[in-house]
From Swiss-Prot:
It catalyses: 3-(3-hydroxyphenyl)propanoate + NADH + O2 + H(+) = 3-(2,3-dihydroxyphenyl)propanoate + NAD(+) + H2O; (2E)-3-(3-hydroxyphenyl)prop-2-enoate + NADH + O2 + H(+) = (2E)-3-(2,3-dihydroxyphenyl)prop-2-enoate + NAD(+) + H2O. Catalyzes the insertion of one atom of molecular oxygen into position 2 of the phenyl ring of 3-(3-hydroxyphenyl)propionate (3-HPP) and hydroxycinnamic acid (3HCI). One of its GO terms (molecular function) is FAD binding. Pathway: Aromatic compound metabolism; 3-phenylpropanoate degradation. Pfam families: FAD_binding_3. Keywords: Aromatic hydrocarbons catabolism, FAD, Flavoprotein, NAD, Oxidoreductase. This is 3-(3-hydroxy-phenyl)propionate/3-hydroxycinnamic acid hydroxylase. FAD binds at residues 17-46, 285-295. Transmembrane segments: none annotated. Belongs to the PheA/TfdB FAD monooxygenase family.
Amino acid sequence: MAIQHPDIQPAVNHSVQVAIAGAGPVGLMMANYLGQMGIDVLVVEKLDKLIDYPRAIGIDDEALRTMQSVGLVENVLPHTTPWHAMRFLTPKGRCFADIQPMTDEFGWPRRNAFIQPQVDAVMLEGLSRFPNVRCLFSRELEAFSQQDDEVTLHLKTAEGQRETIKAQWLVACDGGASFVRRTLNVPFEGKTAPNQWIVVDIANDPLSTPHIYLCCDPVRPYVSAALPHAVRRFEFMVMPGETEEQLREPQNMRKLLSKVLPNPDNVELIRQRVYTHNARLAQRFRIDRVLLAGDAAHIMPVWQGQGYNSGMRDAFNLAWKLALVIQGKARDALLDTYQQERRDHAKAMIDLSVTAGNVLAPPKRWQGTLRDGVSWLLNYLPPVKRYFLEMRFKPMPQYYGGALVREGEAKHSPVGKMFIQPKVTLENGDVTLLDNAIGANFAVIGWGCNPLWGMSDEQIQQWRALGTRFIQVVPEVQIHTAQDNHDGVLHVGDTQGRLRSWFAQHNASLVVMRPDRFVAATAIPQTLGNTLNKLASVMTLTRPDADVSVEKVA
């Protein structure tokens, strides 16, 4: 499967607002988001095309919500398998941990299998929507330098020609071996696992059983995963003394596959590849005008499928902030909140992935025996079983500082958490997901109240200049009540009753939602104005031009 890049004219001595190093998933997502915000973007990739073999196989609800934010989710969904369960098995085949959450609080299934090259291709094609975005393949980044107001990149083409790019900002999405990170001497702290795994992808799935199974066999742990489009992935631990070359030999590959298939000779191999699992975290995510994202900032073992999804979180968190800074709507201090918000959660996902790997393949054999016995007992405790079944162990992103205003008891506050995405009913009767009604914008969402009531004219002017959507949520039966309509306010019905439950639970009637769908603040009408002033301050927002007149509607 070859994904050719479009015929693009070279950019020699060109100036752009953002240069992105790396056309992997994080770089492509950054380019799509910035593209829809009107930012001039240039993506440079040293390969001559997208990587066309399967890599990541798990995409979660947060990543799908990110795809939705750039208008690509409907193109991505055909390459996914929703509600993809993960089951840990003992050597005898007994399931001791079943992970299959059935919740969709963010609008999408929490666990999904997917084919990464096809989703990457969707994102690359998505760039064609934006005349302000270009992607240059076969460009190796040889050097770069930072000045006070720009970054200069020096590239070499496949033909040996030199090109120079000047950008206001550089986003490094160039992978775990990031040239940008190494050039800046940013420590990449962590460790490399002592064992390796060989990944075998097979077409025309010879098993065709659903879900993903992690067999905790002390002789040789392995993974069996059903993927979309009839692809089967097997992963086998490489045992001490074995090499990739040995395992690639037909007789040894046949021996491996005979562990999981009745006829190991009758398969269509897509590829075989040995991986080393790393757990590393960059010490800094921002170095002046350079920002690290995705694997350039953090890498983790695959066992919870969170490497790809963590990169999507980086892109969603960073892109809207970078757009505001470039548009002059916020000072560049806002970009410091990127590391402040993302680094701790990335570390939590690394720790979770390492723990899952130790469950699959404990360092000591006695630990596996203990695991099997304890898990058997815990399965008889319903709260513990639900804890795993509903994936409550997954650290949900929660920010305690950054671009937000937290007041009251931090432990139970929704501030710094992702807001829910239920279905809402529009005034024309259409039912849609909440984000579709908001777009790539801030939102001030009020339960039953006019969100403009507690705002001054100056505040309305400032937040409208950011593209903020003001939304009044009412019970669905009230959607056509004229007395509740206010100019400049979107009126939506609470189709599923989830928004009413959310506001009741959190003792607030107004929420300020950021473009990345995180709760920046909560309030009631009488405190909203003061809260927005605090939020504008912590986000270092600039004031709009004074000659822009805005009429407040009470």
